């Protein structure tokens, strides 16, 4: 039996930039309204395809882990939003807790969970904006291929996008095939 999967069209750079602007506007609205830190979750999805069953399942794991983190720490969640978009899934939480501690826990989750490297958990503070990893003494994200700083490899296009996509897909497939 053959199962045909529709081929998804890639997302244009203009669409990605517009989605990023809309996300920043939502974040700013929440920061103004709640005056509390906001957690923004997106996925690391190299290539043109940003919405697939693989990525949706990965986002599902990320959502579960983030909700568990908030629950375990008994942090008050003032609002939560989840969007399934052609440009990739996005989630926001507004949390009544100090931003630096939230970021420290989010960075640990990104570093310790087998899929965490594919999650981009940003923490934005109403007073000081984005809380960076470096401000907490955390290391920069590493490249999925060569372990150099990810930003440098991404900007220089050091690795073929097909190689990076294959690595991401393998990480996801390995996670869901475990046990």
Which functions belong to the PLM regions below?
Residues 1-69, 73-75, 84, 101-179:
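Long, contiguous binding/interaction regions
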Residues 79-87:
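Short, charge-patterned binding micro-sites
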Residues 89-97:
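Short cationic amphipathic helices and targeting signals
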């Amino acid at each position: 039996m053959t199962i045909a999967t529709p081929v998804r069209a890639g997302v244009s750079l203009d669409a990605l930039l517009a989605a990023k602007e809309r996300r920043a506007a939502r974040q700013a609205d929440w920061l103004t309204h709640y005056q509390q830190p906001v957690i923004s979750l997106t996925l690391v999805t190299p290539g043109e395809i940003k919405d697939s069953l693989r990525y949706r399942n990965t986002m599902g794991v990320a959502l579960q882990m983030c909700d568990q983190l908030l629950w375990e720490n008994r942090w008050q969640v003032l609002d939560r939003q989840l969007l399934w978009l052609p440009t990739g899934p996005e989630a926001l939480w507004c949390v009544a807790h100090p931003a630096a501690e939230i970021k420290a826990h989010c960075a640990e989750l990104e570093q310790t969970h087998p899929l965490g490297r594919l999650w981009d958990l940003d923490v934005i503070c109403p007073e000081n904006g984005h809380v960076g990893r470096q401000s907490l003494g955390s290391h920069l994200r590493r490249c999925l291929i060569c372990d150099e700083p990810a930003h440098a490899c991404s900007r220089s296009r050091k690795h073929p996008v097909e190689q990076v996509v294959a690595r991401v897909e393998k990480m996801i497939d390995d996670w869901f095939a475990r046990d």
